[in-house]
């Protein structure tokens, strides 16, 4: 099935809600403090990530949509760190600074993959004048296609009813990720997206899908909602709308590593898709696919257009398609648990031709999964000259990922993939051409790990260089 992604670049979305900064301090611990019976952590790594409503905005921006973020912060280093991090990923911030309050910050101390303690720096924003938030919403309504209200019960949405009315009066759909059991405050929203536990906290325990539908439809009527999307973890999602049959979508997640931030991804993709002009049903389809991707990543994550495109055509939803190196390592580990043989090859693959396709198909037949490592643009230029590559890296990877024979596509910056191969250690390393096995980059590492190295022949008469020469000759003629 050919599925076209929404035109995210024309979508404008405003996110209003509780913004926060997630700080992580990592380090080893090998002794107990003499001052108290607690471990001593020698901090060697510090990470800062936007959280709460800020993570929703990041998810929208990662799709290529225009994301604006409004929230309450203090006047402190955390607010500055948030603004910088978000600007780096093309989120336009318009924070309301509150000098009497700190920016909400959650500091986690971790050692050996264990969280030892979390320290929260926050004061409720409930008493803060909401008028500056309303003004920012009003100013943006003419240029956005959706408004997301991200509620973490920290006070930024104390006037949520007024915000809903402002948007609905302007004809802008309002999507809300709810918090708590008082859904009365969300009356009149276009769409609520509670997870199953949040939903059941309001309507009671549901033993069957029929009960979810019955109680969900009553909730829609009681609070004058246009729709309700219940996210149900491994059971997928259920979209309920008045006058329409329930739409139940099974989960697309093959491997679940971390559900952190999955709800932010869902509402972000929903909003961006609606703002691009797609229907609510289509938005749920893309959001479900995106959720299947993001839960396969570690930590709070976003989904790129390439990942989403792979997911909706049935590849990335099972951990396949264009990947980062870290994602590939996780996918390979999962494949090995399933007893699958992993084959790996590499090349520039600038202008894909019949020789490439035949070679990759033959390589795939030698195992259960095929990895194709692709030279970056800079690497290609160093190897092939200033006129190459003809096609940029992203396009080369998309084309390769579309081949049925190819399971995973990853890029590398170096002249050879030796470091990458040493990190992956495939069961079989394959290279096309006139090489001797010992001349192939990564062969020593693969052999040392008990793997195999094999040289395959390319199809005669097929060459990217020859194709380029013919094009140049035709232009001259």
UniProtKB/Swiss-Prot annotation:
InterPro entries: Bifunc_HldE, Carboh/pur_kinase_PfkB_CS, Cyt_trans-like, PfkB_dom, RfaE_dom_I, RfaE_dom_II, Ribokinase-like, Rossmann-like_a/b/a_fold. Keywords: Acetylation, ATP-binding, Carbohydrate metabolism, Kinase, Lipopolysaccharide biosynthesis, Multifunctional enzyme, Nucleotide-binding, Nucleotidyltransferase, Transferase. Changing residue 264 to E: Loss of activity. Residues 344-477 are annotated as: Cytidylyltransferase. In the N-terminal section; belongs to the carbohydrate kinase PfkB family. In the C-terminal section; belongs to the cytidylyltransferase family. Homodimer. This is Bifunctional protein HldE. It comes from Escherichia coli (strain K12). The lineage of its organism: Bacteria, Pseudomonadati, Pseudomonadota, Gammaproteobacteria, Enterobacterales. The gene is hldE.
């Amino acid at each position: 099935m050919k599925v076209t992604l929404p035109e995210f670049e024309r979508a404008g979305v405003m996110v209003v809600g509780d913004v926060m900064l997630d700080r992580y301090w990592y380090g080893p611990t090998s002794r107990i403090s003499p001052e108290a019976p607690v471990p001593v952590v020698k901090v060697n790594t510090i990470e800062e990530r936007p959280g709460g409503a800020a993570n929703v905005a990041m998810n929208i921006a990662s799709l290529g949509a225009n994301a604006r973020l409004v929230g309450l912060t203090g006047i402190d280093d955390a607010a500055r760190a948030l603004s910088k991090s978000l600007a780096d990923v093309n989120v336009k911030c318009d924070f309301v600074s509150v000098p009497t309050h700190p920016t909400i910050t959650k500091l986690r101390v971790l050692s050996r993959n264990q969280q030892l303690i979390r320290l929260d720096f926050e004061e409720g924003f409930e008493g803060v004048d909401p008028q500056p938030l309303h003004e920012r919403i009003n100013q943006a309504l003419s240029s956005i296609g959706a408004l997301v209200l991200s509620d973490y019960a920290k006070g930024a949405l104390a006037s949520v009813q007024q915000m809903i009315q402002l948007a609905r009066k302007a004809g802008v759909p309002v999507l809300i990720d709810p918090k708590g059991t008082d859904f009365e405050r969300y009356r009149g929203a276009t769409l609520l997206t509670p997870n199953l536990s949040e939903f059941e906290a309001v309507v009671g325990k549901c033993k069957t899908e029929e009960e979810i539908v019955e109680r969900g439809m009553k909730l829609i009527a009681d609070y004058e909602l246009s729709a309700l999307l219940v996210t149900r973890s491994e059971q997928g999602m259920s979209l309920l709308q008045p006058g329409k049959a329930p739409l139940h979508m099974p989960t697309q997640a093959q491997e679940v590593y971390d559900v952190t931030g999955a709800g932010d991804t869902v509402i972000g993709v929903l909003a961006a898709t609606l703002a691009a002009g797609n229907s609510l049903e289509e938005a749920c389809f893309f959001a479900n696919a995106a959720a299947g991707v993001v839960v396969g990543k570690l930590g709070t994550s976003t989904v790129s257009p390439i990942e989403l495109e792979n997911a909706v055509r049935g590849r990335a939803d099972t951990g396949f398609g264009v990947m980062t190196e870290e994602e590939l390592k996780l996918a390979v580990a999962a494949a090995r648990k399933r007893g699958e043989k992993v084959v790996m090859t590499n090349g520039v693959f600038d202008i894909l031709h019949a020789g490439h396709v035949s070679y990759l198909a033959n390589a795939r037949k030698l195992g259960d999964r095929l990895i194709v490592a692709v030279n970056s643009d800079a690497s290609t230029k160093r190897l092939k000259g200033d006129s190459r590559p003809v096609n940029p890296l992203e396009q080369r990877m998309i084309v390769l990922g579309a081949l049925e024979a190819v399971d995973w596509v990853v890029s590398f910056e170096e002249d050879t993939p030796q470091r990458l191969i040493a990190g992956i250690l495939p069961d079989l390393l394959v290279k096309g051409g006139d090489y001797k096995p010992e001349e192939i980059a990564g062969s020593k590492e693969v052999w040392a790990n008990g793997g195999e190295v094999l040289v395959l022949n390319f199809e005669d008469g097929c060459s990217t260089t020859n194709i380029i020469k013919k094009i140049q000759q035709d232009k001259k003629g």
